[in-house]
């Protein structure tokens, strides 16, 4: 079985503007059942209180649900949505849609683009930025490699992760249970979550032995790093 990957760049005037995407679907140029991932840039501030990312994701789920015959919640579990807030300067709001289809065509004799996706479970607030997140991310990267049909670590050149962050409500919930989050600063949690995610990639690709890592080193020991973007 051979993968065929399609990439569509779709401009938008706002987080919920999917008119161009709807037109592509209606014309037959974009098949909803082949969509595996959507990456987007919205006009939000990119900070903790940027809700344009969730708004855009909800809009996509609502658009695709009737075409796929499933609920909007099911779409969220089927398609990898990665939204990034902030379009300052010359960057325009847009979505990049990745599609994947399989055929019986013979495989290429040279390396080609392959795409795989995977999801972690939801993390408890006190797990974010710690080894639990590293381990779960590593498992997800391994699953994504399998989904993409990639068997060699050296063939992985890009891993896109949408990692969670702490909010005031999550911090309060953890504290009420007697658990201690990695930080009480929501902005600092963004860095801790990214660090744990990056180390998870490194573990999955065999660049770091998970046994050498510990909670205290995440985001602090700069000798531990991953080389894949």
PLM regions and their residue ranges:
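Terminal domain-initiation and capping elements
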Residues: 1-229
């Amino acid at each position: 079985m051979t993968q065929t990957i399609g990439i569509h760049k779709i401009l938008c005037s706002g987080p919920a503007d999917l008119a161009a995407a709807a037109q592509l679907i209606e014309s037959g140029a974009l098949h909803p059942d082949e969509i595996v991932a959507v990456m987007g840039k919205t006009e939000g501030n990119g900070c903790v209180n940027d809700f344009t990312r969730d708004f855009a994701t909800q809009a996509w789920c609502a658009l695709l649900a009737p075409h796929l015959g499933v609920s909007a919640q099911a779409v969220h579990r089927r398609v990898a949505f990665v939204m990034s807030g902030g379009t300052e300067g010359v960057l325009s709001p847009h979505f990049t849609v990745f599609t994947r289809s399989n055929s019986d065509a013979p495989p290429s004799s040279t390396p080609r683009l392959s795409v795989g996706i995977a999801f972690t479970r939801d993390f408890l607030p006190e797990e974010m930025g710690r080894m639990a997140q590293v381990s779960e991310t590593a498992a997800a990267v391994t699953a994504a490699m399998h989904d993409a049909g990639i068997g060699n670590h050296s063939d992985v050149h890009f891993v896109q992760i949408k990692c969670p962050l702490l909010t005031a409500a999550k911090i309060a919930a953890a504290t009420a249970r007697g658990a201690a989050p990695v930080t009480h600063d929501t902005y600092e949690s963004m860095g801790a979550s990214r660090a744990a995610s990056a180390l998870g990639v490194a573990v999955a690709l065999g660049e770091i032995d998970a046994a050498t890592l510990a909670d205290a080193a995440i985001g602090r020991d700069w000798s531990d790093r991953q080389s894949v973007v």
